Amino acid sequence: MLGLEKKLTLYGFNNLTKTLSFNIYDVCYAKSEKAQKAYIEYIDEQYNSERLTKILCDVTEMIGAHVLNISKQDYEPQGASVNILITEEALPLHLIDESCNKGEGIAAQRDTIHAHLDKSHVTVHTYPEYHPDNAISTFRVDIDVSTCGMISPLNALDYLIGSFDSDIITIDYRVRGFTRDVEGKKFYIDHNITSIQDYIDDETLKKYDAIDVNVYQSNIFHTKMLIKEIELQNYLFNKDVNELLPKQRLEITNNLRKEMIEIFSGMNIY
């Protein structure tokens, strides 16, 4: 990782806010409406609020933060949300607001969980989607990690990518505010970064085509990633690829690729 290990000597608290917005799309082929609904039910169960809570708690630990409060909710007919409030330093119990549950026993006790940080937070929302006239279903996960102080959400990128079936990924990272060194000089960013890709493992990047759109003077960084290879069996829901004729395999693969390209581009092309 670049730049995160080199620290400034600051005056007072680090007032920089670092926000990572992470969206992944999982694409699946399910021909009939029945199969599409079954896929949505499957993905909804796979990524319910319990599992999402564990993922976010792992992210919190990876970036060196501590959970103050967790709230979670599963929705009907589908979808889930988890919100975690986090703190950079572990707080003595007498300083923690009595409304904070610290994430203890939440999964076993309640249907809704919210995690709360004193100055930072982690949230996730899921968006399953299908249309009866289209044999391709999609599942989007929207994760936001916002931190204040020295901790950086960039440390959790590889884990987040690996936690989901990530066909298309869009990542936004921005730094806001300023902090001062001991001599009073203002700093608007406290680590080196030229691209979000600098914080993604090379083995992960090999699997994707990636492009950057960065506004360096505004400390705004944007990366989009599109999976290179389509292993068709991985995209068929409850169907064996060997049941398909070669012509069908090619047609389905092309349709999957077209859907991915449109999502990656953010526009209707075909």
UniProtKB/Swiss-Prot annotation:
Catalytic activity line of the entry: S-adenosyl-L-methionine + H(+) = S-adenosyl 3-(methylsulfanyl)propylamine + CO2
Active site positions, chain numbering: S120, H125, C148
Pathway(s) annotated for this protein in UniProt: Amine and polyamine biosynthesis; S-adenosylmethioninamine biosynthesis; S-adenosylmethioninamine from S-adenosyl-L-methionine: step 1/1
GO cellular component: cytosol
GO molecular function: adenosylmethionine decarboxylase activity
Residues recorded with modification Pyruvic acid (Ser): S120
Keyword Lyase appears in the UniProt entry: yes
A Pfam match: AdoMet_dc
Matching SUPFAM superfamilies: S-adenosylmethionine decarboxylase
EC number: 4.1.1.50
Highest taxon in the source lineage: Bacteria
Textual note on the cofactor: Binds 1 pyruvoyl group covalently per subunit.
Biological process annotations from GO: spermidine biosynthetic process
Keyword annotations of the record: Autocatalytic cleavage, Decarboxylase, Lyase, Polyamine biosynthesis, Pyruvate, S-adenosyl-L-methionine, Schiff base, Spermidine biosynthesis, Zymogen
UniProt key word Lyase: yes
PTM note: Is synthesized initially as an inactive proenzyme. Formation of the active enzyme involves a self-maturation process in which the active site pyruvoyl group is generated from an internal serine residue via an autocatalytic post-translational modification. Two non-identical subunits are generated from the proenzyme in this reaction, and the pyruvate is formed at the N-terminus of the alpha chain, which is derived from the carboxyl end of the proenzyme.
First-level EC class: lyase
Cofactor(s) listed in the protein's UniProt record: pyruvate
Site positions (Cleavage (non-hydrolytic)): K119, S120
Family: Belongs to the prokaryotic AdoMetDC family. Type 2 subfamily.
Purpose of the protein: Catalyzes the decarboxylation of S-adenosylmethionine to S-adenosylmethioninamine (dcAdoMet), the propylamine donor required for the synthesis of the polyamines spermine and spermidine from the diamine putrescine.
Subunit and interaction comment: Heterooctamer of four alpha and four beta chains arranged as a tetramer of alpha/beta heterodimers.
Name of the protein in question: S-adenosylmethionine decarboxylase proenzyme
Gene it is expressed from: speD
